């Protein structure tokens, strides 16, 4: 294990949207910044799970691809040259007698005056399809992530699920796939109302309320899927080239739970300054919680500057929490 002896003003744990915007804002406040990300790339779930998916609820963008948003956030942060550490997961956080912090990862030891946790939902894994042979076909043509939408051009695709991801992927596949069928075990979808309206007007075939009963295939992958009616005797077998499963994700904060932080429902409670119960440790984005919290990318973009400005005052009590508007800082 190596020791990174440089002392940073702010170390951001998590390189997703909130973390990247926080890195930019901290740079704008002339803080020495480090970002530690456990994944091989920046962007969090946007890059890892749906880089080709369009996002519609970010201010200023009628729509923007997830990876394009990550690229823009990265370029914005890089203006101030924060130190980026990839493929390191922070295991321990320890406060020292001099009020600074020591962060130990699986590879290095890092030193910082303040910490901002923007770890999203923490470590995540997809909920798997619980049908015989599903694990065998997973490396072939059963997909839990979509990294290249064009790979489904001209294909017969079945999407299984009823939430936002399932509906959004079905709509995005409709123009390029040969045919798209969306299967959900309930009559009603849990997706955004506007997306459901678009779905009903699309050519996507909707099969509800049905659930997966059997997979048919060979050594090359699934060739057909049999679905059974949830409260009936009807079955239907659909020929497929690819199956996309969107049952959501199971997430955990992992080692973060052992850092002495208050934890509430797999999130970190904060006050209006984004302060946790440990002075000098802040949280923003989906990992943070408070009364009325709404988990949106846009919400994290507001929380990040609040956390950074208060961290600035924490390490330098003579600093102002509100630095003025960016138009006067550049």
From Swiss-Prot:
Bilayer-crossing regions: none
Residues binding FAD, per UniProt: 37, 45, 50, 90, 124, 286, 327
Q: For this UniProt record, give its keywords in alphabetical order, as a comma-separated list.
A: FAD, Flavoprotein, NADP, Oxidoreductase
Enzyme Commission number(s) from the entry: 1.18.1.2
Q: How is the cofactor bound?
A: Binds 1 FAD per subunit.
Oxidoreductase listed as a keyword: yes
Please name the GO terms that the record assigns under molecular function: ferredoxin-NADP+ reductase activity; flavin adenine dinucleotide binding; NADP binding
What cofactor does this protein call for? Answer: FAD
Q: Which reaction does it catalyse?
A: 2 reduced [2Fe-2S]-[ferredoxin] + NADP(+) + H(+) = 2 oxidized [2Fe-2S]-[ferredoxin] + NADPH
Q: Which InterPro entries match?
A: FAD/NAD-bd_sf, FAD/NAD-binding_dom, Fd--NADP_Rdtase_type_2, Ferredoxin-NADP_redctase_2
**Which family, according to the similarity comment?**
Belongs to the ferredoxin--NADP reductase type 2 family.
Quaternary state and interactors: Homodimer.
Q: What is this protein called?
A: Ferredoxin--NADP reductase 2
Specify the species.
Shouchella clausii (strain KSM-K16) (Alkalihalobacillus clausii)
